[in-house]
């Protein structure tokens, strides 16, 4: 059954990729880090993603402060899923540059993370994301550049 969180404007190729992730079929690194797009993504359309991360305090480094490395790791996943929503048949990508700007401590029970594909050329995607606190204030801004390549160029040959 099709995942209702994925919009009709997502290509069949991208939809298959998104459905795998949103079903919980995750790479080992996601499992080890506790990154769960299958539980947190609320909606995906071509070039847009909305997630709500349930902050239970387990990623805090101090009272009311989420570890910046966690923000970066989850951000890379969010902007990558957003980029994946705009792929066409046979395309893949890898992160070229990821920048995180923290404006205030990330705290609160539910953090909204929204990502947008701002520009896509044949070889590069540029994605931005906002982390918003429960009060609506901007906690972090994410900037990511993705190198778009044929899938076979990104697969390791043995």
For the regions a language model picked out, list residue spans one by one.
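Terminal targeting signals and extreme-terminal segments of soluble enzymes
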Residues: 1-158
């Amino acid at each position: 059954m099709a995942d209702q969180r994925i919009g009709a404007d997502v290509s069949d190729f991208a939809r298959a990729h998104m459905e795998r992730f949103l079903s919980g079929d995750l790479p080992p690194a996601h499992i080890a880090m506790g990154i769960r797009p299958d539980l947190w993504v609320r909606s995906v359309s071509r070039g847009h993603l909305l997630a709500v991360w349930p902050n239970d305090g387990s990623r805090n480094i101090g009272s009311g402060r989420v570890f910046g490395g966690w923000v970066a790791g989850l951000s890379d996943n969010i902007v990558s899923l957003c980029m994946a929503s705009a792929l066409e048949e046979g395309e893949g990508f890898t992160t070229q540059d990821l920048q995180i700007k923290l404006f205030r401590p990330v705290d609160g029970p539910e953090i909204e993370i929204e990502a947008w594909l701002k520009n896509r050329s044949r070889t590069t995607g540029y994605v931005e994301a906002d982390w918003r606190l429960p009060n609506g204030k901007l906690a972090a801004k994410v900037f990511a550049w993705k190198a778009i390549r044929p899938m076979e160029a990104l697969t390791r040959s043995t």
